[in-house]
């Protein structure tokens, strides 16, 4: 089921809720106090900027943004051009190299071209303090991103959800698998990738599911954004 609805239509009201204002106010105050918060303010909502609701074909759920300098830019697992691919993304590239014929690991870790093709790269939590993983958990972001997933679940059909690791799988518990395709595997982090992420073939499976619906498959070779 396609939709003419936009993100603004389905989650606009959510942004007026008190908890959402409190979350934004907390993050703004932390920045004001001189703390380093990732990603930069202009990039916090990039997942929605690059992938409109009607265009979502695949969802890859992450946890919270990378907390090192110049890494996070609002897309889960992705880093800015010029920054080395972090370990989880390296394992995603390893899996792609065995799963997708002709895939060669790129020299960068920017996944913006995936987002532009309809891959919603959504973190559960949208900000983090520099060097402090999970520091912005339980602020309210989780409530907001639950609403995002609920909006996809209710307003779309045939979306492929890639849920890697217990956190993403719990987050995606309520996705209706009669309406959508839910693929589960361990997280690509070096701690768990060998337990079944490597060899999961989720990227080719996602494309098969898209083609079966008459949709264009994803070109999983990330292209650098045209500046």
UniProtKB/Swiss-Prot annotation:
One biological process term from GO is:
base-excision repair, AP site formation via deaminated base removal
Q: What class of enzyme is it?
A: hydrolase
Which residues participate directly in catalysis?
A: 64 (proton acceptor)
The record lists the catalysed reaction(s) as: Hydrolyzes single-stranded DNA or mismatched double-stranded DNA and polynucleotides, releasing free uracil
Which Pfam families does the record match to this protein? UDG (PF03167)
- State a single Gene Ontology molecular function: uracil DNA N-glycosylase activity
Q: Which InterPro entries match?
A: UDG_fam1, Ura-DNA_Glyclase_AS, Uracil-DNA_glycosylase-like, Uracil-DNA_glycosylase-like_sf
What PROSITE patterns does this protein map onto?
A: U_DNA_GLYCOSYLASE (PS00130)
Q: What is its main location?
A: cytoplasm
Q: Which domain of life is it from?
A: Bacteria
The protein's role, per its UniProt record: Excises uracil residues from the DNA which can arise as a result of misincorporation of dUMP residues by DNA polymerase or due to deamination of cytosine.
Question: Which PANTHER family did the record assign?
Answer: URACIL-DNA GLYCOSYLASE
List the HAMAP family hit by this protein, alphabetically. Answer: UDG
This one is known as Uracil-DNA glycosylase
Q: What organism does this protein naturally occur in?
A: Serratia proteamaculans (strain 568)
